[in-house]
């Protein structure tokens, strides 16, 4: 079996932890959302299940009719992902939901079809209308509580908190300049400003005593004589002091005790007082009690309502229902598990499951938050304000959650419709069933809208496997509920200490989205609350253990974390008493006895793509950013070649991107061709794994996807072995470019400004040749005037032009086409004009058809040429118009299909029986198995499984069996479930194929009779103007292709393949490219591949040693000779091997010329841009240049006949045809537009004709 090449490394020992599955973010999230493969009763209250349980039951307004949700059921995809791409349809499954309706006539249950729901492919993508798309994870502000501070204009620091729910109204409390706390709801500062004390009362704390008891500890102090006055003067009363007989109030709760008041109270005979410990008249609570205009629960409620809804009558019922709706109704206010977790953690409440399930606000939350805010104001050291850019306060919404939120809004729309229909239904004439009142439109349209229009559902970047992988691991702060790129400040975009090991500090786009779109670090995971975690090794008693702990950013704050590169002895103890470590985001030299954790790997800091840059530690961050981004733009080449200098991540990146085919199980290769690999399983050779290879498919970005087998018949393979290479991979490793012999030197000025000089030898060897595939589509429709027809019989077209078309009017495969060639001939009916009688007679005699149809053929657009690689035709079959022969042929096909279906079903049954036998035969039953519906006991507890019992289980459906959870039965459930899924899939495939034989392509759009897709492949060689780059941000444009004989050569006669400008290195500070050059030269000479992982790569000394070992110059510089003159250059030059990439900015796609073309309707000036066949804009500054030279005639024709002088254009055409040399320009159309605009403003502007 073929294995990846072993790479030489200087790393002392391998990482303790392997990288997690790199697309797990996507797959895990969507799996949790749909819970595919779980029985209805096993489903947890998350994802789609949670949404249905939230919205249902729905009751009619009079509560006589109730619609309950029972369970949902997902079908099997009708087509495979590849077939969906081919047909241009969505890869989805049907969603059926079982409801129970209870009304006056009784109880009815029904399964209702709720439309289709897109499902994820194994690679973590969706196929929507035939295009692969990715849903990007969104980083947003976490629900919960945040404490903040801001400086007032008078210099005071004002503290505030904000309770942010997952859904619902924001609650904000702010200190003002007078130390009073005001509550704002939904950030409406002026209109909804409510004193916090009023709000507390409205929550149900009606008396002042209740409120004081909540905020202070209360002590009872004796008052027997005037001696006790000293201890009591200045203290604050915690309760009213009332005369028992006369009910007179001598002291109110919250009042400060004075000597006179104490005397009055002593005279009444009161012997003890309740005192608020720690309260004084300056305490915010005491101040607010004095300021509060209300004194009871009812008054506070009304005041709250009045401020919230000024102008509306404040009744008690209205006020109570408003506050309930705002914060205590789970349908309108939801903190979510995350919000509750964050709030409880901050305020010190318990974090058990029961508490975390309380999603609405509680009174205790508001009191707790106000207490914390007051402690913060008082300067309590145990309190702190929150940093909103810290990753403890930002969380990730992955695919599942984003779609769940959209489903919720769709079902909420449906809820209104259901209520309306329940009310309007006429029970006298018909019986009500769930199917009659449920409309699936709401859910379907919301999902369709999300996948096709949402900012977070993006067309997948498929330029190469790395681009694909990165797209799935991308994090965006934009999108609905996120930030706005115009308003986002510097702080949000900046790298934060908490990003370490979670978000890559390097990989982000240049331009307006910098810092808003980021990438997950290589080891990062997302936990159940949506916070990003990173792994650390646990350190106990100074010993670094192999135990791994995943930590979120807030937990990490409390730990002292050593670097992964800290040196350990053979007992895993630190070699030195002091090492570099991090604590609360700051790096310092820590005593090793205080270290609690250690990094898992130095590369946990960066993302996968950044981790592919060798010698990253020697590159400036700005250039590393460019290097990361440009690797994603590398075009897959015809001949792939792995990098000599890698980082060790290449194999893993290729595997997780899905570009290569990997063995799922151990086995032996039984059959190999370019389309399929068959592996017989090791445990049971009768069972086969079949791997279909992708051949010359078009990717989203027009590059070519092609897989080639690496194994041979008889090879023994183990799980995870590479069976086939894909695009931009070489022997299972990522291979984005070529290893090229470069020299850093100027050469006749051709490499000025980062330009690149390449040898013609690279072109001859097809080193940088790539294949591009263009797709052209044409549809024939049924129009009002008649049917369009795909045919070879096109009016007014010569036979020469039709040479490459087949009899059916479609170009033959293998034909070479160039711009303007016909790919598919099509004629469209023209609207019939009134004909003269003699014309009608002639038409009748000669039967001229050409007059009533027009040519609407598909032609090759400008700038495209290549070979027709594939043609796909989709058409509907009309049942009535089939001939007898066709019907006979159809029957034969159907018979063959049925035979194939039966044989496959029999094979499945045999495999299923074998699996059950292997698990159960002669084993003892750990628990009874009961039939749900009949309640029959199929297997007694303790019984021995025999063949008969196994056959009995084999016939039953998993849904009908009650199986107790245990190890053996869990495996049994998996076997039964996978068998049922396989049978279901086989049945769907059979029905789909049968339907296709009978109906043709029934899923074509309405009105389409036939659809033809033509694929044209073109080979693009490297040419002048193409953009190339290394992995260190060293980019440039090919300026000259030099004959091999003229290139500089080494003393041994070997010519250099590429020349780079040495001035591109010092100012850019990307020295990684120089080290790569030296190490690449040494490794190439030694015939080995090396890996230099980021931050733990080859030291310089080791590179020099390798150079000397291989007999290369120890300074890495060689004397070169000029290929043109044969003379030696004066100075020594750095020569070595660099891995250079060809980027997808090819000159062939950008070069453009126009002779004639379309004009803008309003201004009558030529359109702009290549896509519109536009012209080059000759703008104001260009006009100045011509004016400076005084070229009057050229100026005149540029501003008139070459632009928007409509009559002049026609005249100049005529004069060119006649061979005259005459320019008579008229009025430019833009002048008329100006006049019309002024007239539109009501100005009477008319050009005056003055006689000369």
From Swiss-Prot:
Disulfide bonds: none
GO CC terms: DNA-directed RNA polymerase complex
Pfam families referenced in this protein's UniProt entry, alphabetically: RNA_pol_Rpb2_1 (PF04563), RNA_pol_Rpb2_2 (PF04561), RNA_pol_Rpb2_3 (PF04565), RNA_pol_Rpb2_45 (PF10385), RNA_pol_Rpb2_6 (PF00562), RNA_pol_Rpb2_7 (PF04560)
Disulfide bond keyword on record: no
GO biological process, one term: DNA-templated transcription
InterPro entries: DNA-dir_RNA_pol_bsu_external_1, DNA-dir_RNA_pol_su2, DNA-dir_RNAP_su2_dom, DNA-dir_RNAP_su2_hyb_sf, RNA_pol_bsu_bac, RNA_pol_bsu_CS, RNA_pol_bsu_protrusion, RNA_pol_Rpb2_2
Catalysed reactions, as listed in the record: RNA(n) + a ribonucleoside 5'-triphosphate = RNA(n+1) + diphosphate
One Gene Ontology MF term: DNA-directed RNA polymerase activity
UniProt keyword annotations, A-Z: DNA-directed RNA polymerase, Nucleotidyltransferase, Transcription, Transferase
EC number: 2.7.7.6
EC class: transferase
NCBIfam families, alphabetized: PRK00405.1 (NF001616), rpoB (TIGR02013)
Subunit structure as annotated in this protein's UniProt entry: The RNAP catalytic core consists of 2 alpha, 1 beta, 1 beta' and 1 omega subunit. When a sigma factor is associated with the core the holoenzyme is formed, which can initiate transcription.
Protein function: DNA-dependent RNA polymerase catalyzes the transcription of DNA into RNA using the four ribonucleoside triphosphates as substrates.
Family to which this protein belongs: Belongs to the RNA polymerase beta chain family.
Protein's name in the database: DNA-directed RNA polymerase subunit beta
Source species: Chlamydia trachomatis serovar L2 (strain ATCC VR-902B / DSM 19102 / 434/Bu)
């Amino acid at each position: 079996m073929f294995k990846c090449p072993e790479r030489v490394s200087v790393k002392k020992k391998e990482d303790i932890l392997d990288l997690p599955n790199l697309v797990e973010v996507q797959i895990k999230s969507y799996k949790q959302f749909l819970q595919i493969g779980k029985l209805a009763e096993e489903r947890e209250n998350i994802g789609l299940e949670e949404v249905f349980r939230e919205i249902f039951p729905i009751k009619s307004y009079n509560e006589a009719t109730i619609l309950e949700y029972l369970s949902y059921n997902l079908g099997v995809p009708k087509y495979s992902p590849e077939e969906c791409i081919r047909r241009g349809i969505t890869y989805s499954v049907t969603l059926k939901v079982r409801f129970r309706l209870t009304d006056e006539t009784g109880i009815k249950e029904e399964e209702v079809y709720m439309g289709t729901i897109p499902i994820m492919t194994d690679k973590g993508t969706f196929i929507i209308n035939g295009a692969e798309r990715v849903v990007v994870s969104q980083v947003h502000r976490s629900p919960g509580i945040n404490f903040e501070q801001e400086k007032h204009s008078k210099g005071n620091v004002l503290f505030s908190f904000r309770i942010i729910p997952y859904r619902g109204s924001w609650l904000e409390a702010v200190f003002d300049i007078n130390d009073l706390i005001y509550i704002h709801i939904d950030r409406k500062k002026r209109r909804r400003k409510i004193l916090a004390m009023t709000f507390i009362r409205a929550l149900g704390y009606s008396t002042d005593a209740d409120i004081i008891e909540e905020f202070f500890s209360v002590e009872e102090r004796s008052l027997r004589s005037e001696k006790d006055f000293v201890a009591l003067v200045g203290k604050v009363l915690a309760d009213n002091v009332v005369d028992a007989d006369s009910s007179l109030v001598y002291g109110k709760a919250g009042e400060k005790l004075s000597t006179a008041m104490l005397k009055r109270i002593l005279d009444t005979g009161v012997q003890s007082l309740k005192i608020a410990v720690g309260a004084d008249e300056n305490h915010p609570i005491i101040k607010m009690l004095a300021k509060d205009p209300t004194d009871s629960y009812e008054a506070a409620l009304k005041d709250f309502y009045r401020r919230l809804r000024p102008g509306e009558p404040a009744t008690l019922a209205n006020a109570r229902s408003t506050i309930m709706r705002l914060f205590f109704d789970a349908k309108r206010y939801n903190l979510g598990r995350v919000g509750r977790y964050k709030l409880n953690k901050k305020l010190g409440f318990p974090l058990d499951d029961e508490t975390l399930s309380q999603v609405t606000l509680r009174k205790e939350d508001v009191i707790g938050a106000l207490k914390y805010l007051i402690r913060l104001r008082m300067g309590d050291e145990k309190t702190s304000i929150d940093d909103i850019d810290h990753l403890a306060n930002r969380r990730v919404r992955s695919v599942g959650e984003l779609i769940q939120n959209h489903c919720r809004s769709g079902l909420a729309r449906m809820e209104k419709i259901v209520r309306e229909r329940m009310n309007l239904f006429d029970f006298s004439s018909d019986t009500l069933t769930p199917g009659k009142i449920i409309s699936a439109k709401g859910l379907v349209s919301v999902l369709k809208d999300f996948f096709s229009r949402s900012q977070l559902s993006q067309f997948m970047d498929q330029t190469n496997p790395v681009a694909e992988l990165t797209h799935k691991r991308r994090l965006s702060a934009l999108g609905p509920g996120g930030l706005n790129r115009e308003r986002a400040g510097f702080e949000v975009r900046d790298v934060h200490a908490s990003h370490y090991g979670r978000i890559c500090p390097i990989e982000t786009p240049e331009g307006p989205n910098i810092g808003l779109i980021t990438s997950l670090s290589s080891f990062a995971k997302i936990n159940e609350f949506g916070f990003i975690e990173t792994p650390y090794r646990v350190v106990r008693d100074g010993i670094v253990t192999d135990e791994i702990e995943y930590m979120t950013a807030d937990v990490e704050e409390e730990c002292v974390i050593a670097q992964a590169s800290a040196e350990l002895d053979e007992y895993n103890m630190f070699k030195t008493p002091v090492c570099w470590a991090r604590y609360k985001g700051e790096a310092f030299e820590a005593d090793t006895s205080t270290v609690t954790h250690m990094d898992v790997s130095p590369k946990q800091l960066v993302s996968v793509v950044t981790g592919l840059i060798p010698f990253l530690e020697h590159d400036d961050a700005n250039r590393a950013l460019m290097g990361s981004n440009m690797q994603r733009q590398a075009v897959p080449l015809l001949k792939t070649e792995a990098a000599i200098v890698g980082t060790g991540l290449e194999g893993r990146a290729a595997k997780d991107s899905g570009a290569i085919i990997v063995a799922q199980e151990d086995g032996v290769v039984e059959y190999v061709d370019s389309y399929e690999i068959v592996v017989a399983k090791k445990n049971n050779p009768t069972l086969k794994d079949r791997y279909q290879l992708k051949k010359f498919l078009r990717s989203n970005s027009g590059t070519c996807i092609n897989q080639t087998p690496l194994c041979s018949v008889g090879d023994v393979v183990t799980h995870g072995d590479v069976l086939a290479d894909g695009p931009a991979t070489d022997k299972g490793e990522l291979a984005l470019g070529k290893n090229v012999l470069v020299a850093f030197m100027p050469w006749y000025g051709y490499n000025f400004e980062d330009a690149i000089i390449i040898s013609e030898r690279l072109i001859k060897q097809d080193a940088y040749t790539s294949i591009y595939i263009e797709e052209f589509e044409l549809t024939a429709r049924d129009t009002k005037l008649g049917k369009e027809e795909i045919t070879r019989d096109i009016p007014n077209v010569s036979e020469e032009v039709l040479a490459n078309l087949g009899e059916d009017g479609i170009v033959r495969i293998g034909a070479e086409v160039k711009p303007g060639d016909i790919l598919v001939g099509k004629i469209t009916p023209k609207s019939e004009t009134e004909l003269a009688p003699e014309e009608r007679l002639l038409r009748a005699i000669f039967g001229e058809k050409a007059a009533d149809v027009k040519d609407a053929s598909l032609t090759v657009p400008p700038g495209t040429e290549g070979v027709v690689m594939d043609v796909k035709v989709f058409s509907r079959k009309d049942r009535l118009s089939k001939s007898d022969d066709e019907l006979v042929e159809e029957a034969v096909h159907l018979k063959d299909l049925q035979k194939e279906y039966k044989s496959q079903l029999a094979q499945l049954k045999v495999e299923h029986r074998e699996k059950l036998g292997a698990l159960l035969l002669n084993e003892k039953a750990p628990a009874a198995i009961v039939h749900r519906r009949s309640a029959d006991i199929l297997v007694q507890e303790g019984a021995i499984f025999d063949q008969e019992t196994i056959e009995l289980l084999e016939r039953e459906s998993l849904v009908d069996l009650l199986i107790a959870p245990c190890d053996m039965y869990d495996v049994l459930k998996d076997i039964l479930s996978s068998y049922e899924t396989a049978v279901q899939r086989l049945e769907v495939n059979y029905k789909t194929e049968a339907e296709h034989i009978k109906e043709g392509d029934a899923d074509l759009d309405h009105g389409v009779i036939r659809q033809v897709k033509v694929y044209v492949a073109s080979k693009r060689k490297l040419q002048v103007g193409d953009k190339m780059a290394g992995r260190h941000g060293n980019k440039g444009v090919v300026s000259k292709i030099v004959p091999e004989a003229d290139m500089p050569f080494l003393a041994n006669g070997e010519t250099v393949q590429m020349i780079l400008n040495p001035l591109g290195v010092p100012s850019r500070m990307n020295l990684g490219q120089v080290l790569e050059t030296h190490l690449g030269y040494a490794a190439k000479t030694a015939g080995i591949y090396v890996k230099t992982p980021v931050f733990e790569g080859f030291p310089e000394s080791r590179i020099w040693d390798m150079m000397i070992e291989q007999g290369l110059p120890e300074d890495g510089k060689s004397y070169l000779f000029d290929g043109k003159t044969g003379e030696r250059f004066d100075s020594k030059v750095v020569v070595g091997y660099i891995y250079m990439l060809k980027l997808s900015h090819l000159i062939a796609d950008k070069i453009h010329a126009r002779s004639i073309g379309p004009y803008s309707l309003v201004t009558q000036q030529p359109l702009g841009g290549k896509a519109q066949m536009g012209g080059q804009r000759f703008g104001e500054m260009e006009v100045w240049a011509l004016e400076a030279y005084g070229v009057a005639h050229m100026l005149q024709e540029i501003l008139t006949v070459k632009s928007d002088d409509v009559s002049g254009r026609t005249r100049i055409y005529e004069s060119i045809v006649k061979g005259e040399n005459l320019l008579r320009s008229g009025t430019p159309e833009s002048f008329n537009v100006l006049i019309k605009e002024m007239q539109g403003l009501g100005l009477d502007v008319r050009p005056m004709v003055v006689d000369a």
